[in-house]
């Protein structure tokens, strides 16, 4: 699943291609991707210019003239900016036809991704974005400590809870726990104020470094066909030996993750 660094990489890449392009029409091949009424979505989005693309957590926000829409890539969603005469891939589900004669195609092998209309000026306070916690970069130490202090979930599971802290998924939760020397099974409520401060710093540093490397390319992630490089810096996720002691890394699921 694309996490914060991967979605940020997609955002930056897409801005290079589609900013200031007008959406002429939309072809909806798999309607369930769009949570709104299809005709309403088309009517509000068509003939609008893509003025900016924002990101909150793992969500992209396409900011148009009068409206915006949220795009959640979920497990394997991705965008391709292609010539309009390029043959459709069987996993291309939403096609945005642009005024430069090209197409922005939403491709999703699993079909789990979703799009939803939101207001242009207040989208952060509307669902699904309003239920998100802060990203590590903006987390308040005191508020995060109070949240975790009331949480008896394993710390790794708490890191995956987007209402507590936004943008972290399985890959970076593993890396954060390792960098802190923190047992993933440790109850979140056991973290001290000092540990929470360290957690914010470590998480921010790891995510920032991953963004610099263009994210982690594992399985299906790429930004318009451009792979990220952070996978070569992973310490424990999908690794076999500990980079510090050389011991074998064992894989265990925590709350199914």
Task: Report each predicted region and the residues it spans.
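Surface-exposed binding/hinge segments that line
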Residues: 1-115
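Phosphate/anion-contacting hairpin/loop surfaces
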Residues: 65, 69-167, 172-173, 177-179, ...
């Amino acid at each position: 699943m694309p996490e914060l660094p991967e979605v940020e990489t997609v955002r930056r890449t897409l801005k290079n291609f589609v900013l200031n392009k007008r959406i002429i029409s939309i072809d909806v091949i798999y309607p369930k991707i769009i949570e709104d009424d299809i005709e309403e979505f088309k009517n509000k989005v068509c003939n609008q210019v893509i003025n900016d693309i924002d990101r909150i957590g793992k969500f992209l926000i396409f900011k148009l003239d009068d409206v915006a829409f949220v795009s959640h890539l979920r497990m394997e969603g991705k965008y391709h900016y292609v010539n309009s005469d390029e043959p459709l891939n069987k996993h291309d589900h939403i096609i945005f036809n642009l005024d430069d004669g090209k197409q922005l195609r939403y491709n999703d092998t699993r079909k789990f991704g979703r799009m939803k209309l939101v207001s242009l000026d207040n989208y952060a306070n509307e669902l699904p974005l309003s239920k998100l916690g802060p990203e590590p970069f903006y987390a308040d130490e005191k508020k995060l400590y109070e949240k975790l202090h009331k949480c008896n979930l394993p710390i790794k599971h708490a890191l995956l809870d987007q209402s507590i802290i936004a943008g972290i998924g399985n890959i970076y939760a593993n890396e954060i726990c390792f960098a802190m020397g923190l047992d993933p099974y440790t109850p979140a409520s056991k973290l001290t104020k000092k540990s929470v401060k360290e957690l914010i710093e470590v998480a921010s540093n790891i995510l920032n470094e991953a963004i610099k490397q263009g994210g982690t390319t594992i399985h299906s992630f790429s930004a318009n066909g451009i792979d990220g490089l952070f996978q070569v810096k992973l310490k424990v996720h999908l690794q076999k030996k500990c980079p510090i002691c050389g011991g074998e890394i064992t894989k265990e699921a925590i709350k199914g993750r």
